[in-house]
Design a protein with these regions (language model features):
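Beta-rich carbohydrate-recognition and catalytic domains
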Residues: 1-152
C-alpha cells in the first residue's frame, strides 16, 4: 500500500481546519479543484469537508466553499479560516483571495443551517485590512471562537 506519494497540483490539499460539534469531528481543508494546472496550486482553492465520529472512519461531504467569480473578494480562492457554531447556525470565517482587488486578502463570512450547505454573506468582505496598520498582502487566516457565556 502506498501511503506517501508526491501530489500533483490537482491533488493539492492543506491547512486543516478542525471543528467539533454534537459528537462529530469535522475537518475542512484547502483543496485545489480537479484539473488544476496553474501554479501556485492554491489559486481557486476550495474548502473540502470530511466528518467522523471516531477520528478513524471519515465520510467525505460535498465541498463547503468555492471561489467566487469576477471581482468578488474570494474570486481567486477561499483560503484558511475557522468554523464556529452559534445562535443556531454554523459560521465560517475565511480568507477571501482576489488577485485583482485593491485588498487581495480579506476576511469573508459564510453561514450554514446544517453544516453542509453554505451561503456566503452578501456583505463580504466583512473585514478589510487597515493599511496604516497592516499589509495588503499576508493579512489572512482568521481564528474566531464563540463565547457561550456572552453569546458572541
Amino acid at each position: 500500500m502506498d501511503f506517501f506519494r508526491k501530489m500533483s497540483f490537482a491533488d493539492s490539499t492543506g491547512d486543516a481546519i478542525p471543528f467539533y460539534h454534537e459528537g462529530k469531528y469535522h475537518i475542512f481543508s484547502l483543496t485545489s479543484p480537479p484539473g488544476t494546472t496553474v501554479y501556485p496550486a492554491r489559486l481557486r482553492t476550495t474548502w473540502s469537508h470530511s466528518v467522523s465520529e471516531d477520528l478513524v472512519h471519515w465520510e467525505e461531504l460535498p465541498t463547503a466553499l468555492y471561489p467566487g467569480e469576477g471581482d468578488e473578494p474570494d474570486a481567486s480562492g477561499v483560503w484558511t479560516g475557522s468554523v464556529i457554531y452559534g445562535e443556531g447556525k454554523y459560521h465560517a470565517f475565511y480568507t477571501g483571495y482576489c488577485l485583482t482587488a485593491e485588498y487581495q486578502q480579506t476576511i469573508c463570512h459564510a453561514t450554514s443551517e446544517d453544516g453542509i450547505t453554505w451561503t456566503k454573506d452578501a456583505a463580504n468582505p466583512v473585514i478589510t485590512p487597515m493599511i496604516e496598520l497592516y499589509e495588503k498582502l499576508d493579512w489572512r487566516d482568521p481564528y474566531v471562537f464563540y463565547n457561550e457565556e456572552d453569546k458572541c
